[in-house]
Swiss-Prot record:
NCBIfam families: PRK00278.1-2 (NF001370), PRK00278.1-6 (NF001373), PRK00278.2-4 (NF001377). The keyword Lyase applies. One of its GO terms (molecular function) is indole-3-glycerol-phosphate synthase activity. Belongs to the TrpC family. It comes from Xanthomonas oryzae pv. oryzae (strain MAFF 311018). It catalyses: 1-(2-carboxyphenylamino)-1-deoxy-D-ribulose 5-phosphate + H(+) = (1S,2R)-1-C-(indol-3-yl)glycerol 3-phosphate + CO2 + H2O. This is Indole-3-glycerol phosphate synthase.
Amino acid sequence: MSDILNTILARKADEVAERSARVPLAELIARSADLPLTRGFAAAMQASIAAGDPAVIAEVKKASPSKGVIRPDFHPADIAVSYEFGGATCLSVLTDVDFFQGSDAYLRQARDACTLPVLRKDFTVDPYQVYEARVLGADCILLIVSALKDAQLADLSGLAMQLGLDVLVEVHDVDELERAVQVPVPLIGINNRNLRTFEVTLQTTLDMRAAVPRDRVLVTESGIVTQADVQLMRSNDVNAFLVGETFMRAAEPGESLRQLFFAHD
């Protein structure tokens, strides 16, 4: 596990304690009991792919630990509208405050502005956060294999599905992938960024794709910058993408998405 991930996870444990002191778990559970159905994140991804289109998870991200502020002029609702117009299948919204300058409010703003399913992009390590995601209005959560033990993976994914949330399980190497496929969720993300060096190579996805069961949707994450990158993936039967920074640096994120994935149409 990388030093930055260790630091983030230690902070998450404190954050859960702080938040549960303000809003007790029992209250969250009660609030999660009578909510509208989620929008169907995995189903939307599968439908895009079945139609022959790339399934694009477009990320709403202000900053990152490695790059600092990526988009100073940051308006989640406007970004969400732009992404939907540009052809995104789903959204990913950063809610981590301390390391990514995210906010729960950003998720609400983005989701309220569009009809797309939304992933809560955060470091989920505790059942409290799963209930919290459902109450916030998320349609899907992220579980990072390198941050969790097998029992946690099973428990958190099981709870999410029980609450009607989809789960994107993220891996970085073959060992993590072997652990991820034990969890019965349809979405497996392969992050092309090395957690130790922060280097990005698309070869990570290409090397691992054959080990992903055919009944799962493989989502390639990080490093998709050019139409050639997209074509490389699609020619290798990788049809789902999570892209953030490339779009966040563009004046019009949705137009950047359209140019990257649909300009040939």
